[in-house]
């Protein structure tokens, strides 16, 4: 068991992790996803050796320390002046979320999409975009966006929202147009 912090430097632009099977690439990505608000995939190594995850990053020119302890539902963010806490999972309508904070740093309003055939707006979280930051080679086909998922799989809907953001569609588009698109 490692009784110290492990520092893994990332590039300022983009970082690629490559290597043989079983060296920890997926585990590293899962830890990054966890600190950003997703569920942790608990392997024996994670269970035995990881107490928390902390990312030091520059986001929109501001240095942030983003931290989440194992078995915690709270994300703690420290900037140059303040400390903020966000629920990793929960009702995103009741308070400011971590995604809202990131959007604010970028000078954006939280992104919302109309859900399916209803006129209810749904927020697109930062985590929805993270699914496309790690691409498994065996998933680089028509299942990439989970559009074939049955029974209303949440990834199908969230992937649809992310694609619509890429295509510059948001709730500002008239509801009638979106409803017509959903009929197709």
Predicted regions and their residues:
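Extended, charged alpha-helical "arm/stalk" segments used for dimerization and assembly
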Residues: 72-175
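Short beta-strand micro-motifs enriched in acidic
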Residues: 67-71
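Extreme N-terminal "head/tail" segments of very large remodeling/mechanoenzyme assemblies
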Residues: 1-66
């Amino acid at each position: 068991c490692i009784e110290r912090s492990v520092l893994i430097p990332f590039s300022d632009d983009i970082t690629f992790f490559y290597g043989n099977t079983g060296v920890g690439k997926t585990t590293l990505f899962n830890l990054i996803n966890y600190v950003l608000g997703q569920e942790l995939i608990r392997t024996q190594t994670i269970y035995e050796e990881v107490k928390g995850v902390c990312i030091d990053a520059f986001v929109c020119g501001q240095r942030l320390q983003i931290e989440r302890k194992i078995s915690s539902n709270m994300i703690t963010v420290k900037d140059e002046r303040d400390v903020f806490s966000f629920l990793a999972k929960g009702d995103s309508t009741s308070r400011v979320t971590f995604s809202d904070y990131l959007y604010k740093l970028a000078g954006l309003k939280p992104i919302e999409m109309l859900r399916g055939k209803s006129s209810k707006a749904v927020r697109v979280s930062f985590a929805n975009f993270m699914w496309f930051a790690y691409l498994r080679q065996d998933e680089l086909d028509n299942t990439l966006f989970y559009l074939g998922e049955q029974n209303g799989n949440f990834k199908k809907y969230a992937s649809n929202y992310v694609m619509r953001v890429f295509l510059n569609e948001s709730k500002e588009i008239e509801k009638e147009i979106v409803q017509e698109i959903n009929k197709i």
